[in-house]
Amino acid sequence: MNTSPKQSGYLKVGNGHEVYFWTAGNPQGKSALYVHGGPGSGTDAGCLKYFDLDTTYVILLDQRGCGQSKAVNPLLHNTTQDLVGDLEALRQHLKLERWTLFGGSWGSTLALVYAITHPQVVEQVFLRALFLGREQDWAEMLLGLGKLFYPYEHQTLLKAIPQACRTDFTKFTNYFYEVLQGNDSALKTQLANAWVKWENTLLSPISYVKDEKAEDANFTFKLALLECHYAKHHSFLKPNFILENVAVLKDKPVHLIHGRFDLVCPLSQALELKRALPTLNLYVTNNAGHSGSDPNNLTTIKHLLKTQL
């Protein structure tokens, strides 16, 4: 599989931000935008594993403040609405009339908000590990379900912060947010590592999924900072924005693959979306968690993209 970029460059989107984009696959094939997670994960060649590059033209973008994108200040002018605007600016820059979206975890949030905002240019939506992006969803990931399965690992996370901030989501995120923007380099590193290590603990019920990028101190810090930024601000969305507006997609094919044992984005969120969008094609994968690399998730995603895209 040739994963070399067909086209790459920077798109100036204003307010000191330049977002990096690249494409791969067949330019004459069906256009599919890969929307990465995090926020803050960025893109790399591994993101292409889901696609048939002989028949698909894959477009990838590093969201504001991460990957190879450039920013004067990564947190200023970095909201969900800004990211949606960047995706639309990229579509226009590439002169694509319509495209299909594929996003997992936070990428599913952003893909849905984009599709709700610009339904006229969206062919289909493929989602993995749905994340609705509400305050309660962030709180569940950081302080909720996972601690029942990994209590010792969760205690390690909590021990990194003052006791008064360990059970209240607002105090928890405020403390991380303040420290990660502060001047104590050692403490910033400690908290960023604790945040990302906890998230990685929850990725897969089958075995510990090693994210090699997480060993990169710069990547780890950016990921923790941007996730905390979006968690603190409840994804910059009104409560239940997706559920209350997703009906605009009722006439479009929307597919969701969700691991039954996802501890980052519990299956209950997928069921909420199904109730709000009865036409949703929901595929629950057994013996699978959050990671797109879990065998049952990966096999299902590749099959759907190959047969439905």
Curated annotation (Swiss-Prot):
Keywords on record: Aminopeptidase, Cytoplasm, Hydrolase, Protease
Annotated ranges, domain AB hydrolase-1: 33-291
Main location: cytoplasm
InterPro entries registered for this protein in UniProt: AB_hydrolase_1 (IPR000073), AB_hydrolase_fold (IPR029058), Peptidase_S33 (IPR002410), Pro_iminopeptidase (IPR005944)
Location of this chain's protein in the cell: Cytoplasm
UniProt-recorded Gene Ontology molecular function terms: aminopeptidase activity
EC number: 3.4.11.5
An example Gene Ontology biological process: proteolysis
Gene Ontology, cellular component aspect: cytoplasm
Catalytic activity: Release of N-terminal proline from a peptide
Active-site residues annotated for this sequence: 105 (nucleophile), 262, 290 (proton donor)
Similarity comment text for this entry: Belongs to the peptidase S33 family.
Function: Specifically catalyzes the removal of N-terminal proline residues from peptides.
UniProt-recorded name of the protein: Putative proline iminopeptidase
UniProt source species: Mycoplasma pneumoniae (strain ATCC 29342 / M129 / Subtype 1) (Mycoplasmoides pneumoniae)
Taxonomy of the source species: Bacteria, Bacillati, Mycoplasmatota, Mycoplasmoidales, Mycoplasmoidaceae
Gene that this polypeptide is encoded by: pip
